[in-house]
Regions:
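Active-site neighborhoods and metal-handling regions in enzymes and metal-associated proteins
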Residues: 1-184
Length: 184
């Protein structure tokens, strides 16, 4: 269970969180451009490890107690989430999710994204990616400032996914930013 951490962040912590998020977004932008058929999951892991070092950050997946055998989760096709990077070589049309936690000056950012390798998504793949992206935006739109409850955000996300006839695996939801990966 994550540690309950309360209180305001200092201006420096806020700056470090933003910088950590910028690093994570940059790595994801680079992966969107770089991942192609013929590249392996281990190639991705090596690239991401190098970029994290370049930024002067650290890979902090999953927790300090769990020694994850890589710096990024790479879940391909039917794999659900949190898969270890392997020597699997991507093929055109693979649906791949990347999940990464970066630490920087004591702050952590945790995020994931999904893409289709070397093709424009069509059919079920397009439906999945579009619906999940729309659910993200619905969750963001549900944030109305101080006092917004996680349940309000979750309900907005769930409504979009239900309408799209997609389910939620309740034990595997959420990403975060703060002193811990899933700060509450």
């Amino acid at each position: 269970m994550p540690t309950l951490i309360t209180g305001e962040k200092t201006p420096q912590q806020m700056k470090d969180m933003r910088e950590c998020g910028r690093m994570l977004a940059t790595i994801y932008d680079e992966l969107r451009q770089r991942v192609t058929a013929g590249m392996s999951e281990l190639d991705v892991n090596e690239f991401v490890a190098g970029r994290i070092r370049d930024f002067g950050a650290e890979a902090t997946y999953l927790t300090d107690e769990v020694k994850f055998p890589g710096v990024i989760c790479v879940s391909t096709n039917e794999q659900l989430v949190h898969s270890f990077p392997t020597d699997y070589v991507f093929e055109k049309g693979d649906v791949v999710s990347f999940d990464l936690v970066i630490g920087y000056h004591g702050m952590k950012t945790d995020s994931a994204f999904t893409m289709v390798v070397d093709e424009e998504p069509r059919g079920a793949k397009k439906h999945l990616l579009h619906a999940t992206e729309q659910s993200l935006y619905a969750g963001i739109d549900a944030i109305s400032g101080e006092g917004t409850r996680v349940g309000d955000i979750s309900a907005a996300i769930e409504a979009v996914l239900k309408k799209a006839k997609l389910g939620i695996i309740r034990e595997l939801v959420g990403h975060g930013v703060g002193l811990e990966m899933h700060q509450y």
